[in-house]
Amino acid sequence: MVVSVLALCGLMVLAACSKKEEQPSNTMAEQQAQPAPAATPIDPATVATVNGTVKFDGTAPKPAKIDMSQDPGCKGTNEAENIIVSGGDLANVFVYVKDGLGNRTFDAPKDPIVLDQKGCQYHPHVLGVMAGQTVQIKNDDPTTHNIHPTPKDNREWNESQPPSSPAIEKNFAREEIMLPVKCNQHPWMKMYVNVVKSPFYAVTDKTGKYEIKGLPPGDYTIAFVHEKLGEQDQKVTVAAKETKTVDQSFKAGGE
């Protein structure tokens, strides 16, 4: 009789402990189920613009020729895109608001950013995307490619894409600048994804120009980042409805 009572008491204690252990899991589930904070509204009547030109100071290196003969599906000539300069203007510089937005939050666009593979090159060579936004990857070549991001702060993945296959859709959850992407099938194929938390970014075109629209008035740090030449930062203050020009230059060696 005594043994039965003790056994019953032991079961009651175990049941009570189990209930206590379950409580943190329920609390955690409730926290995970909470919706993301709403995007911070911006008054469109007050937004400002920052634009400018990025220059290369010095003698630009000649683009290296790429030998693509290992794959008959890669036709034509190809040149390295690590430093593209035309008339002193520097292309493929990622420009973004690095600091000054405070605790503002922004919704990722629903429309995807397209990354294409054509002529056994990635297009574009430098791409900007918001965290959580879809990147749609296409293959317009008559050969198989292998898309392989090698991030520091995001999840690494490696996926083959045969010709004429459906687009691959991916996203990156964390902010990361100059995230390298390569193709395991074609070692010369390289590009860079830039993942940011706000829509305030741009990539310089072949004339070195960029434009960032829709900024709320304030004090900001604008970062200019190049895959080989490094990063340059500038402070800028924009008033309501103001358009401010912020130019930048890079020297060989990232000076």
Task: Label the predicted regions.
Residues 1-15:
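Sec-dependent bacterial lipoprotein signal peptides
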Residues 17-255:
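Extracytoplasmic copper-binding redox domains, predominantly the cupredoxin/blue-copper superfamily
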